[in-house]
Amino acid sequence: MPSKPIKQTCAPGWKNAVGGLRCHQWGKGEWKVRGRIGRIPPREVPQRLEQDSGGGEEMSQLDPYRELAEAIGAGGSEIIAKIFQLLATEDEAKVLLAASPPATMEQLAQKTGFAEEKLLELIRSLFQKGLLFYSEKAGVRRYYRVRHVPQLHDATAVAEDAPRELLDLWRLYTDTEWPNYAKKVEAFLPQAPIRVIPVNVSFQGGSRILAFDDVRSVVDGARNLAVTRCTCRAIARRCDKPLEVCIQVNRAADYAVERGTGRPISKDEALEILRRCEEEGLVHVVDNRKEVDHVICNCCKCCCMNWPPLKAGVKRFILPSRFVARVDQSLCSGCGTCTQRCFFDAIELTDGEVAKVDPDKCMGCGVCMVKCPTEAISLEEVRSEDFIPQ
């Protein structure tokens, strides 16, 4: 793995509302991080995975990594197998294969045959790499391996010193295989795992704004918070939207800080990050349940891995909010700002040069409202409280 980023002197003027001034150099290339919500440029990656030509011996070396890919529902994906191979040694792969169902150190030692000292070293390494997690109950710690592709994606690509080869493999996977994976697992999902949560700007009279509809209420009710970089933008590099904007909540914040992939933030800083993201036109995405206690993602249109499944027709992956945008046509100036900001092609200008919303396409994010110069757009409640599961 490359060494940790080297601090450099950045060009003047690279500051923002959140503060900080950093610049990083990584390998032969160079990218800059704009303060505490950084930006990185796009770059080209291979359009396909180069096939190994080393014969049967090299192919057999991939076998435990293929088994791990199969275990997280990505059987047949050589890219996911390569990601496991890049990150985990053969001994570490052995521990991962033994860590399902969740197991104590003693159980892992029995399954793998590793001595306690070596096993502890492997566990620490796997934890730092984002491949192994733990839970504690009644004073007993149990370790479990990464459970699915999105978790593998977020946990392995979040570190600032993630190897470039890893990021390129992830970009190749999300560009080529990810929508099909989402289609395959959709049939087994009891409910959509994530949903859009609206910005807090303007709601029509009579609309009920409940705590789980309000991203600021999520922040206010959090025990603790941390911020990490957006793995999707770190991988795809297709835009210059803010980078350090994924807000981890409660246990996810504990994990990010313990691992060193995130930094603790105050509620005020979290709210400032959200405000900046709304100005930038990013969509808030959270867990699809009433108690949001994991993460608040702030997603762009071009890099985020949440949108390709939606475009591919996967209905039970990400759900809209309980609201739909409505336009007061008497106030609309026909400037077209909302059509440019909408991710979902849900707004168009009519022949009379006023905006019209397609409710079947609208995800109820409210991004269109933030920059409306005449305040012609508001959100209307169209789905009941029961739309959001417990």
What positions do the PLM features span?
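Short, amphipathic alpha-helical interaction segments positioned at domain boundaries
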Residues: 140-177
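Short amphipathic alpha-helical interaction segments
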Residues: 112-128
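A short, conserved structural fragment
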Residues: 127-138, 347-348, 377
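Short, Lys/Arg-enriched N-terminal segments with co-localized hydrophobic residues
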Residues: 39-58
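Short amphipathic alpha-helical interface segments
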Residues: 87-111
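Ferredoxin-like iron-sulfur electron-transfer modules
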Residues: 285-295, 312-341, 345-364, 378-388
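Short alpha-helical segments that sit at the start of domains
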Residues: 65-92
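Catalytic cores of enzyme domains
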Residues: 178-324
